[in-house]
Amino acid sequence: MLVKTALFVTLIGLAQAGPLPAKSSGSEDTYDSHPQYSFNYDVQDPETGDVKSQSESRDGDVVHGQYSVNDADGYRRTVDYTADDVRGFNAVVRREPLSSAAVVVKPQATAVVPKVQLKPLKKLPALKPLSQASAVVHRSFAPVVHHAPVTHVVHHAAPAHSFVSHHVPVLKTTVHHAHHPHAISYVF
């Protein structure tokens, strides 16, 4: 019964779906063997002082263009450029002073002397010790050393009929007891 139900649901789904739409031929990109374009823009912002412009045109593989910008030092930089397959990219740069260029004035140094009113110092009496205290004496005592007898800890394992073997190096150490002042140590 489950197989019949699954087959019925599948047939209804196929009937509702319908055929796939055919590819539309209008959305294909075409290759332009001789591209042509031309654009330009101009920015004049008196609030920030940003003044620049650019224009460019292309005819096939040859591009001609120009851009200019007003630099902060009072000059306009203009770049004329050409790019093609034969000569590559070529640019000619010109710098021309702006007509409204500001005259830079050399700064003059002025001496500023602060007026300081000095008051005479008050003479205070010298400090006298309140009492003659004895000098502080530091004494060192012999260090306290704790002695304990040397004990050797030996662990014995009961014999086993079967064991798990691990292939790792065995660390064997000899236990020594050293006398250290003011230290507590445990040797296992």
Curated annotation (Swiss-Prot):
**A GO molecular function held by the record:** structural constituent of pupal chitin-based cuticle
| Top-rank taxon | Eukaryota
Question: Where does the record locate the signal sequence feature?
Answer: 1-17
Q: Where is this region: Disordered?
A: 19-67
Chain intervals with Basic and acidic residues compositional bias: 49-62
Q: Does the keyword Signal apply?
A: yes
Protein's name according to its UniProt entry: Pupal cuticle protein Edg-84A
Record's GO cellular component terms: chitin-based extracellular matrix; extracellular matrix
Instruction: Spell out the InterPro entries in the cross-references.
Output: CHIT_BIND_RR_consensus, Insect_cuticle, Insect_Cuticle_Struc_Prot
Biological process (GO) annotations?
chitin-based cuticle development
- Tissues where this protein is expressed: Imaginal (anterior) epidermis.
